[in-house]
């Protein structure tokens, strides 16, 4: 029983740490890509490179911005659950399923947006000679470096979100495990030792 409580505590600490990491890294990725721009002059015409010029980068900024806000809200939920330790645990399964589903969706969205932005950025960096698309990073080097930094943060945020989804799965499915000596609630979830799901 003490080992189960220790494992549960480690899972909660890991959840908070990963939520902080996702929040910070996703916000950093969105800020780096979203604020990056560079202006070049071609034959007295100014052309400005912005993230809005590439739809995959728009998706990256939107997905990571939303993930940062979601992680911040989940951190507030964790803090509220830690502060409020008493009361009924009847809704633990509903909360755990909701958090698990949302964390899975966020992990998938971050990985998909990052993969799309990486692929588009490779085309921007190397071009596509078969289609006569020239590489643009030679012209907009500072912008491309800024996007590269944002993509590095986006990859890290995506990996942290995947780990967080695994922790959420643990938090959910431990409610249905039989080893904790808990009793079955009316919802079918184990609610042993008064443990709450945050």
Curated annotation (Swiss-Prot):
How does the record classify its membrane topology? Multi-pass membrane protein
**What is the protein's major site of localization?**
membrane
Membrane-spanning residues where?
A: 13-33, 56-76, 92-112, 150-170
Which Gene Ontology cellular component annotation is one that this UniProt entry carries? plasma membrane
Q: Which Pfam families match?
A: CASP_dom
Compartment annotation:
Cell membrane
Q: Which domain of life is it from?
A: Eukaryota
Segments in the Extracellular topological domain: 34-55, 113-149
Concerning InterPro entries, the annotation shows: CASP/CASPL (IPR006459), CASP_dom (IPR006702)
Q: Does the keyword Manganese apply?
A: no
| Protein name stated in the entry | CASP-like protein 2B1
- Gene source species: Oryza sativa subsp. japonica (Rice)
């Amino acid at each position: 029983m003490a080992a189960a409580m220790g494992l549960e505590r480690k899972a909660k600490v890991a959840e908070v740490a990963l939520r902080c990491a996702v929040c910070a890294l996703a916000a950093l990725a969105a800020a780096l890509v979203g604020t990056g721009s560079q202006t070049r002059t071609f034959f007295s015409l100014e052309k400005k490179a912005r993230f809005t010029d590439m739809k995959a980068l728009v998706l990256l900024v939107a997905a990571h911005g939303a993930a940062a806000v979601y992680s911040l809200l989940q951190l507030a939920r964790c803090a509220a659950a830690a502060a409020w330790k008493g009361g009924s645990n009847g809704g633990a399964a509903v909360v755990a399923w909701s958090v698990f589903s949302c964390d899975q969706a966020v992990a998938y969205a971050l990985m998909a947006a990052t993969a799309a932005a990486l692929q588009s950025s490779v085309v921007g960096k190397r071009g596509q000679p078969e289609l006569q698309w020239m590489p643009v990073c030679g012209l907009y080097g500072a912008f491309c470096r800024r996007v590269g930094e944002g993509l590095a943060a986006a990859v890290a945020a995506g990996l942290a979100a995947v780990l967080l989804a695994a922790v959420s799965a643990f938090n959910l499915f431990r409610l249905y495990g039989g080893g904790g000596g808990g009793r079955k609630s009316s919802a079918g979830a184990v609610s042993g030792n008064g443990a709450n799901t945050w």
